[in-house]
């Protein structure tokens, strides 16, 4: 039997360190990181680090050897090497002062594409849709960032364009399902091709960019994510029979911007627009052909006409024979009644897609237009902005006078009072739109009137801890809490004496006990309550004993797992109890304030 050489099998063969991988690929560390991000290769943790590192215990990063071998055949790797030589040549030309050569080199800069990597990592379109959450979050983050020395203006504009194209598609197809306005930003959830997609849009506030963030890694992710979103948007727009990329109204983009500046046209409309131009071009070609045609003699024309007649007669005879021979099949309908025919589902079958279709909203200038515009358009509603009307009044006063604002049904305001109200309009706060969208129904407007205290804006995805804020507080729980407070005030000595008493006492002993308690100044009703609590405590102690016995029978691994599980359960229950106590206190204060207001 041959002796195996150390470090040639097992973990030492399956894993490779980062320094070894960089040497093998012959690239810089920055290019290696970019390549790993593009290909989706991440560090691995071997079971035995010492064996994987061939006896060394130094802290290192490991990768699978197969992954690094897979990177050797990547075309982008060759482009990285070409760029390295290009940078050397450019630096040499600039150092010599050869500006024309430097310009030629700049024109021939090596470029790479990520299309083949997208196809490798996402073989089907649904795979890309399932992984679209992180790209959307990253792109919306960069779209709201200001341009700095590390992040150029071109990158932020490209991210903004892609995100607006995504929002325009979701609003056009009415795919939005849930909205939640939080401290971090606005969470949206849409159902795209049967896949639930959730993303976060930050608020458009001035942001302080931290200095400890490595923007090189973030920009690498952004490059990959933008390519992926281009693929997804192209497929979604084509499936919806829309032109991609959508046309942009430059006048609106200079003014308000947002979704209103993106004009989504179907491909049929684009073809109709091109048809008149095509007809004109065809007519001009025919005219030129007529001019170029030579005049034929009368004999040639008569021969051609006779030949055409004979061909037409033969063709008609053949067609009549074929038609006589063919017998058409008759398909009788199996449906006895005409009412049994099923109606096809409409495009906007979900309740949220047509929730606000009958309303026209007038949005005040103090309300964030981008959030409400997206939500209202996704629910089928129409929107008129006060800011857009102000711009129209300044730039085109004649068209502004022709506008008819009598069709407006709702006005969204975010002010405590409205100075002058228009008859026929319903005045609501912005939260009404979000809550209606989350509940998939129109809620009463009275709670959302200007100046009213709004109901709590709850997350539509619920609480992971199990706390339900909509659930009513049971009166029994309140009674138990009051009993606990009373018992805390009373003396501990009497409690201990009562808990030690047994339930199966004789009547004489019970009477003697009541006399002793009355002498101590405790009422008989309170003593009965304490007896009940003592019985509950005994039941709990019996359950605890059973649990302890079960723990003894567990193995060491099972016991540790049970402790971890119990710790998590206790933590959730403690959080739930704290939240219910806070809610009870709030309800008490509200009730007291209501009583004071009634008295006044």
Curated annotation (Swiss-Prot):
Keyword flag Secreted: no
InterPro entries assigned to the protein according to its UniProt record, in alphabetical order: BRCT_dom (IPR001357), BRCT_dom_sf (IPR036420), PES (IPR010613)
UniProt KW keywords: Coiled coil, Nucleus, Ribosome biogenesis, rRNA processing
Gene Ontology MF annotations: large ribosomal subunit rRNA binding; ribonucleoprotein complex binding
Family per record: Belongs to the pescadillo family.
Residue runs in coiled coils: 478-600
Function: Component of the NOP7 complex, which is required for maturation of the 25S and 5.8S ribosomal RNAs and formation of the 60S ribosome.
Domain of life: Eukaryota
Entry's Gene Ontology cellular component terms: nucleoplasm; PeBoW complex; preribosome, large subunit precursor
Ranges of Basic and acidic residues composition bias in the record: 569-580, 588-600
PANTHER family for this protein: PESCADILLO - RELATED, PESCADILLO HOMOLOG
Biased composition (Acidic residues): 478-509
Subunit structure of this chain's protein: Component of the NOP7 complex, composed of ERB1, NOP7 and YTM1. The complex is held together by ERB1, which interacts with NOP7 via its N-terminal domain and with YTM1 via a high-affinity interaction between the seven-bladed beta-propeller domains of the 2 proteins. The NOP7 complex associates with the 66S pre-ribosome.
UniProt xrefs under Gene3D superfamilies: BRCT domain
Gene Ontology BP, a term: maturation of 5.8S rRNA from tricistronic rRNA transcript (SSU-rRNA, 5.8S rRNA, LSU-rRNA)
SUPFAM superfamilies: BRCT domain
Keyword Manganese assigned: no
Region of interest (Disordered), ranges: 454-600
Biased composition (Basic residues): 530-539
Annotated protein name in UniProt: Pescadillo homolog
Phylogenetic classification of the source organism: Eukaryota, Fungi, Dikarya, Ascomycota, Saccharomycotina
Protein species of origin: Debaryomyces hansenii (strain ATCC 36239 / CBS 767 / BCRC 21394 / JCM 1990 / NBRC 0083 / IGC 2968) (Yeast)
Main location: nucleus
Protein's cellular compartments: Nucleus, Nucleolus; Nucleus, Nucleoplasm
Domain BRCT: 351-450
